Design a protein with these regions (language model features):
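Short, aromatic/basic amphipathic alpha-helical patches
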Residues: 126-137
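RNase H-like two-metal-ion nuclease catalytic core shared by retroviral integrases
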Residues: 70, 118-119, 146-160
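Extended, low-complexity cationic-aromatic segments
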Residues: 15-98
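Short catalytic/ligand-binding loop motif for oxyanion handling, primarily in non-cytosolic enzymes
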Residues: 41-43, 122-125, 155-156
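Short, basic/hydrophobic alpha-helical segments
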Residues: 94-114
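Short Lys/Arg-enriched helix C-cap and helix-to-coil transition segments
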Residues: 1-15
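Short glycine-/polar-rich loops that comprise or flank the Walker A/P-loop
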Residues: 29-30, 80, 110-112, 140-145
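Acidic/histidine-rich, metal-coordinating catalytic segments
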Residues: 111-124, 149
Length: 160
């Protein structure tokens, strides 16, 4: 099928690297954190919701006013049960750089922060350098051991 990705040797090797990182025992000095982001639509109620009353559930109208969009960055440290979220106006290299700064600040005693994230174009050292300067970017990036998740390539096949 044209929409099924091929799992080639490079994909499998990168996947195994991520899984091996997840299998390591917890070490506070080397936290394993995962980062991702999601665009969201902001809504406002057209009518005020009705609060719950004895014997009646709260009610909220299904109509809403669209109030633009935003972005949510989520950072999860699964083995410690910690998570951080950050709402930003958009998903940009500047926002990513600021989230990485906040991440490193949140782990002042970590020797190395293992960061698992996808291959989005802003998920790179250049985003930090462009917006925070070479010196701060070098410091922040040196605190990270980045592990990118594997990227699937679509299978090349003909459609009949």
């Amino acid at each position: 099928m044209w929409c099924v990705a091929e799992l080639d040797d490079a994909y499998i090797a990168q996947m195994e690297d991520v899984l091996a990182l997840y299998e390591k025992p917890y070490k506070a000095a080397e936290p394993v954190v995962c980062l991702d982001e999601k665009p969201i639509v902001l809504h406002a109620d057209l009518r005020p919701p009705r609060p719950a009353q004895p014997g009646h559930l709260a009610k909220r109208d299904n109509e809403y006013k669209r109030c633009g969009t935003a972005n949510i960055f989520a950072i999860v440290e699964p083995k410690a049960g910690r998570h951080f979220t950050c709402a930003t106006p958009d998903r940009s290299a500047l926002q990513f750089a600021q989230v990485i700064r906040d991440l490193v600040t949140a782990y002042p005693f970590a020797r190395t922060i293992h960061l698992v994230m996808d291959n989005l174009n802003i998920h790179c050292r250049k985003s930090l350098t462009d917006h925070l300067g070479e010196r701060e970017a070098n410091y922040l990036w040196s605190r990270l051991q980045v592990q990118y998740t594997p990227k699937r390539q679509l299978a090349q096949s003909s459609r009949d």
